[in-house]
Amino acid sequence: ALRCQADWDAHPQGQAVAALPLIAPERIGDAPPRALREGPRPLSGLKVLDLTRIIAGPVGGRALAAHGATVMRIASPALPFIDWAVKDTGQGKYSAYCDLTTEEGRQTLARLVADADIVLDAYRPCALERLGFGPADLARLRPGIVHVSLNAWGQQGPWAGRRGFDSLVQTAAGFNDEEGRAAGDGAPRALPCQALDHGTGYVVALAAILMRLRQAGEGGSWSVRLSLARTALWLRSLGRVEGAFGLVS
């Protein structure tokens, strides 16, 4: 439902999201520190499995690839190939299909995880756990792994298990209402881009790098959970430029 920001702040899910940090790391296993690899680019030698699709997660993988990481995009053959999205966010990545509903597919992914530094995950909460690739499983397969997951509504609260995407979160969290107010006519308006997706994508890349550095310093296996709704709250906290609605000449 369309809400203003005050209504979202009073909603149980809005309150649950407000109680979360933007980046919520959790140590999920023990492992010795693993030294960073040297190379010509900042992330040279970093191996990333990108199990995400559409915008938010793939933007994170693209940012890591742009700084030298070796990123493999893992796609399900059962899901549609979205041409524009892959052209935009697949740059610099390898791509492969892997059907995790089959034993062969699960064995293939397990072998890839065993050689990875980072796994990006945008599956619905608990979906990968049911397939044998939850955070604890990843830490067992690859001690020292960094797991970065994202969802729409956050990791706690009554909507934690719901599916969602940028436009729904914009509407529920008051962004469309605020855009209408800024336009002066009060009619709900979407942001001019999928800002929550793109913003969260860059937070994905930041979190992955931060936790890989932490692993190199103190060891351990790590999981970080992010959400579009928490990114929305962070973007709100940055404030707005009054009178800046429309094109700037």
Can you say where each PLM-predicted feature lies in the sequence?
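Acyl-CoA thioester-binding alpha/beta core of soluble enzymes
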Residues: 1-78, 106, 110, 114-118, ...
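The feature captures the short pre-catalytic strand/loop hairpin that immediately precedes
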Residues: 175-192
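Hydrophobic alpha-helical scaffolding
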Residues: 99, 118, 158, 162-165, ...
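Short, well-ordered alpha-helix to beta-strand connector turns
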Residues: 68, 92-93, 116, 165
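Glycine-rich phosphate-binding loop and adjoining beta1-alpha1-beta2 segment
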Residues: 69, 73-99, 104
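Short, hinge-like loop/turn segments at secondary-structure boundaries
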Residues: 18-20, 89-92, 163-169
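N-terminal Rossmann-like NAD(P) cofactor-binding subdomain of oxidoreductases
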Residues: 102, 121-174
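Rossmann-like NAD(P)-binding element
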Residues: 93-128
